Amino acid sequence: MQNMVILGATGSIGASTLSVVACNPEQYKVYALVANTNVAKMLEICIAHQPKIAHMVDAQAAQSLKQQLPSHLDIEVTTGEDELLSLVSSSDVDTVMAAIVGAAGLPSTLAAVNAGKRVLLANKESLVMSGQLFIEAMQKSGAQVLPVDSEHNAIFQCLSERSQLEIGRCDLAGAGVSHILLTGSGGPFLTSDLATLSAMTPEQACKHPNWSMGRKISVDSATMMNKGLEYIEARWLFNASSEQLKVVIHPQSVIHSMVQYRDGSVLAQLGNPDMRTPIAHCMAFPQRINSGVEPLDFFKVGQLSFLEPDFTRFPCLALAIEACKQGQEATTVLNAANEISVQAFLDGKIRFTDIARINEQSLMNTATHPLNSIDDILALDFQSRQSTLDAITKLN
């Protein structure tokens, strides 16, 4: 029986994780659930899964949850940053699902890594921001980090066992790998007239053709910044050079990514676009468990198609690839700028096409400094956020 902590329990990855747990109750126990402010959802899942601990980042939310939980449930409600870091480091915890969205997930994810936990990594921003520090912490503690993002999970499944055991330091060329092919659907605006993009609404941007996701990642998929962040994540997870990484647009979202080998072979992982599949794979690795996902029906799929990315349509993807080449400071700045600009778009303060412009401006205007600690990273993250907020204010 594995004791699990689910960071970001009220989000879409949290819901999918709890669904997989419910399919395999004899193997997994929900030890703790962690959320930010969503008391109603947290109350619902606490009653359903009865964790030992329910942690709310927001203190008022914690108080509200404590008042609403049925008295017969023996659930400890906690709040506070120190309490969260202690929770993920606890000797009672075996596995941590790291699914808090954005930079907010970095401290708790890194704490779990430092504690040597089995970390199921859904928070791509942790690697985008901390990169080398994250990999070094993983190697020092012996933590097992397994990629939950469908693309990185697909790549992981297509690699040799030796490469799987050497995440963060694998020798792709030595394993015969010539290219990692990251696939992406192209989002809801793949075929939209470029002249119409500036008028696209948050509701339109959040209507992904294949996946069910939260609003922030849905917008990132529409701009293809999500693929850019995944490019950066792949660079660190698989110790890949820019020459070894390629992005391929695949509108059907059936092939989740591919690995091309020196001998001409291409290995691909296919499946229905449902996050329960990579989650179940990570939870059980190297075994296999029931995910609750319907088997892929090839006759319904009918055909698979592939396109080269158009950087005029997807400038955010180009920005992320360039930031990756520049290094850790640039990717930290870009991630922070993007979080702010996407939220501004969702709040109706800027246009869809302003996201890329503001991100590029922040990347050029934010002064960087060497990142030698998590405090350095968070300081640069804050600096970039302030610079981006200033740019949005001037725009309006």
From Swiss-Prot:
Its pathway is:
Isoprenoid biosynthesis; isopentenyl diphosphate biosynthesis via DXP pathway; isopentenyl diphosphate from 1-deoxy-D-xylulose 5-phosphate: step 1/6
Source organism superkingdom: Bacteria
Q: What class of enzyme is it?
A: oxidoreductase
Binding positions for 1-deoxy-D-xylulose 5-phosphate per the UniProt entry: 124, 150-151, 185, 208, 221, 226-227, 230
Record's catalysed reaction(s): 2-C-methyl-D-erythritol 4-phosphate + NADP(+) = 1-deoxy-D-xylulose 5-phosphate + NADPH + H(+)
Cite the InterPro entries for this sequence. DXP_reductoisomerase, DXP_reductoisomerase_C, DXP_reductoisomerase_N, DXPR_C, DXPR_C_sf, NAD(P)-bd_dom_sf
The family database entries (SUPFAM superfamilies) matched by this protein are listed as:
1-deoxy-D-xylulose-5-phosphate reductoisomerase, C-terminal domain, Glyceraldehyde-3-phosphate dehydrogenase-like, C-terminal domain, NAD(P)-binding Rossmann-fold domains
Name what cofactor the protein needs: Mg(2+); Mn(2+)
> What are the UniProt keywords, alphabetically?
Isoprene biosynthesis, Manganese, Metal-binding, NADP, Oxidoreductase
Q: Name one Pfam family in it.
A: DXP_reductoisom
Q: Which residues bind NADPH?
A: 10-13, 38, 123, 125, 214
| Example of a GO biological process term | isopentenyl diphosphate biosynthetic process, methylerythritol 4-phosphate pathway involved in terpenoid biosynthetic process
The protein's role, per its UniProt record: Catalyzes the NADPH-dependent rearrangement and reduction of 1-deoxy-D-xylulose-5-phosphate (DXP) to 2-C-methyl-D-erythritol 4-phosphate (MEP).
By sequence similarity, the record places it as follows: Belongs to the DXR family.
The record's section on PANTHER family has: 1-DEOXY-D-XYLULOSE 5-PHOSPHATE REDUCTOISOMERASE, 1-DEOXY-D-XYLULOSE 5-PHOSPHATE REDUCTOISOMERASE, CHLOROPLASTIC
- Protein name, entry field: 1-deoxy-D-xylulose 5-phosphate reductoisomerase
Organism of provenance: Shewanella halifaxensis (strain HAW-EB4)
